[in-house]
């Protein structure tokens, strides 16, 4: 685990700590109409099962705002209300939810922001100042355009507004739709404030596009010690946002959990359908949370070398294959018996490791 993380002020969203020494949390956003409590609850349940720590819901009208009271009662995750344009919806939402997200570029005047702050103070809930490059306040957009400098100036201006109202329980996000502006904005602001950062690339595209952008931007920032909570925005299935976010946390050294998959890119030596087999193995073992390095190889040439560094490896040969545990061959089996035996061995190893950690 990396030890270079920037220490920030800690806030709480429900029972989830954000900032300080707290683990970096993941979140997503439901796409149902929030007033449809059954559908929204179903999506929150899916996110909980996928490993999300927090959930955000859109509050587009008064009906959505009023539904939050009942939704909060059934939500298994802390609830963040996402408010644009209509500050009065934030006043209603603050009575029920665990946090409020506002976009200072469209929420309105200082008086409206003060009203939101007062409501959050009363309920002791935090705010996210959500700055987006595409919707900066007029004074910053005209002076700087949708640039990192413009985003940072907006964030500083709004942080000062909240501080002047004697309110410091907030986090900040600086989102653009491309990697470089996102990284530069967060880097620029980090030494200027003590508040926790919510990381994200906004409107990042489909699964492929978003995974690349988010891995580069968020992974890069995380490895620099920047970031306290995050969302990977994907045009697609909710669960993928959490799956990709947790993978980024693992591979940037911020989360020690789950399997690190090692598999070869295939070549003329492979003697099995490695693409299907690697996918099948990963799906079958996706429930494992124990940190393990697992190797799936299409021939013994690569496998014997890679297996020296893997906790468990499988190597396919001509209608047969090897299972290798911690560098030693423990099974040579016919192809038809390889898969199930390998799954059992990995699950047993995970149990052994968990037991040793508890002991």
Swiss-Prot record:
Q: In which pathway does it act?
A: Isoprenoid biosynthesis; isopentenyl diphosphate biosynthesis via DXP pathway; isopentenyl diphosphate from 1-deoxy-D-xylulose 5-phosphate: step 5/6
Which Pfam families has this protein been placed in?
GcpE
Domain of life of the source: Bacteria
Q: How is the cofactor bound?
A: Binds 1 [4Fe-4S] cluster.
The record's section on InterPro entries has: Dihydropteroate_synth-like_sf, Enolase-like_C_sf, IspG_bac, IspG_bac-typ, NO2/SO3_Rdtase_4Fe4S_sf
Q: Does the keyword Oxidoreductase apply?
A: yes
Please name the GO terms of the biological process aspect recorded for this protein, alphabetically.
isopentenyl diphosphate biosynthetic process, methylerythritol 4-phosphate pathway; terpenoid biosynthetic process
Report the EC code(s) recorded for this entry. Answer: 1.17.7.3
The cofactor(s) it depends on are:
[4Fe-4S] cluster
Report the catalytic activity. (2E)-4-hydroxy-3-methylbut-2-enyl diphosphate + oxidized [flavodoxin] + H2O + 2 H(+) = 2-C-methyl-D-erythritol 2,4-cyclic diphosphate + reduced [flavodoxin]
Q: Coiled coil located at which positions? A: none
Residue sites binding [4Fe-4S] cluster per the record: 264, 267, 299, 306
| Record Gene3D superfamilies | Dihydropteroate synthase-like, Sulfite Reductase Hemoprotein, domain 1
Keyword set for this entry? 4Fe-4S, Iron, Iron-sulfur, Isoprene biosynthesis, Metal-binding, Oxidoreductase
Molecular-function GO terms, alphabetical: 4 iron, 4 sulfur cluster binding; 4-hydroxy-3-methylbut-2-en-1-yl diphosphate synthase activity (ferredoxin); 4-hydroxy-3-methylbut-2-enyl-diphosphate synthase activity (flavodoxin); iron ion binding
What family does this chain come from, according to its entry? Belongs to the IspG family.
- Main role? Converts 2C-methyl-D-erythritol 2,4-cyclodiphosphate (ME-2,4cPP) into 1-hydroxy-2-methyl-2-(E)-butenyl 4-diphosphate.
Official protein name in the record? 4-hydroxy-3-methylbut-2-en-1-yl diphosphate synthase (flavodoxin)
Q: Which gene encodes it?
A: ispG
